[in-house]
Swiss-Prot record:
GO BP: translation
Name of the coding gene: rplV
Complexes and interactors: Part of the 50S ribosomal subunit.
The name this protein goes by in its record: Large ribosomal subunit protein uL22
Gene Ontology molecular function, alphabetical: rRNA binding; structural constituent of ribosome
Biological source species: Prochlorococcus marinus (strain MIT 9312)
InterPro entries (UniProt xref): Ribosomal_uL22, Ribosomal_uL22_bac/chlpt-type, Ribosomal_uL22_bac/org-type, Ribosomal_uL22_CS, Ribosomal_uL22_sf
Pfam families: Ribosomal_L22
């Protein structure tokens, strides 16, 4: 048996130990997943969330990896997958009244974005 499926090259970039919770980063990643590189950059520029800056940095790194490692054209790239996982939690303490202390959890996350070249659509016209 021969495998006739075409393999696509995928470039991945990771941003580790990014300050911010994974759930707030996922809110932005859900909006750009499946979009083209240029559309995603425009969306990230105008979103009012703090997590857009590190996401933009990771996205640009993924596109640079695609250009350098595989020679892909940035105008044809789409975001095939994007995810955020929980990172380590930094624990801090805030002094309170009567000798108490409340804990403050400063969350981090790991952002990963993979891009691949968009499938080219060939219009096969039947000529009579």
């Amino acid at each position: 048996m021969t495998n006739t499926s075409e393999t696509t090259k995928t470039a991945i970039a990771h941003g580790n130990y990014v300050r911010g919770s994974a759930s707030k980063v996922r809110r932005v990643l859900d909006q750009i997943r499946g979009r083209s590189y240029r559309d995603a950059l425009i969306m990230l520029e105008f979103m009012p969330y703090r997590s857009t800056d590190p996401i933009t940095k990771v996205l640009r790194s993924a596109v640079a990896n695609a250009e350098h490692n595989y020679g892909m054209d940035p105008s044809t790239l789409i975001i095939s997958s994007a995810w955020a996982n929980n990172g380590p939690v930094m624990k801090r303490y805030r002094p309170r009244a009567q000798g108490r202390a409340f804990s403050i959890k400063k969350q981090t996350c790991h952002i990963s974005i993979s891009v691949e070249s968009a499938p080219t659509q060939i219009n096969a016209e039947v000529q009579n």
